[in-house]
Amino acid sequence: MNVLYTKIFFILILTRTSSALKCVQCFTGYGNIVQDCNKTSYSEPKECADPLSNYCFIGTRYENGTEYIQRYCAIFSIKDQCIEKNNIKACIYTCETDGCNSASRLQISSLVTSIISVLYLITFX
């Protein structure tokens, strides 16, 4: 019976690995390493190394007029949100389809976030 469970386990793992999620994976402006995540060479989705990765992640930080971007695979989903404190704005987005964390996805999300922020300020301020 244990042999049967072992076979099923490996079949499930191999099946999941062969259909792994593909996310854009790059970062900008950390230490001496700088990549432009908006360039075509970094915008091609790559298969996530961790078979548990079910989400793609985009993290942005705006500080002193500079934008820092991270795009990676993620194991869990985080509610899309932006936080602003001490003149630093950080935004987090997750999604579930191949390549959904590309530069075009971020531009759409940033536009939606900006519109919601303006509507909030008009309504509640």
Swiss-Prot record:
Keywords: Disulfide bond, Secreted, Signal, Toxin
Entry GO MF terms: toxin activity
Tissue: Expressed by the venom gland.
UniProt-annotated location(s): Secreted
Domain of life: Eukaryota
PTM annotation, UniProt: Contains 4 disulfide bonds.
Primary localization: secreted
Signal peptide from the UniProt entry: 1-20
Family: Belongs to the scoloptoxin-05 family.
Further information: The scoloptoxin-05 family has remarkable similarities with the three-finger toxin family commonly found in snakes.
Name of the protein: U-scoloptoxin(05)-Sm1a
Source species of the chain: Scolopendra morsitans (Tanzanian blue ringleg centipede)
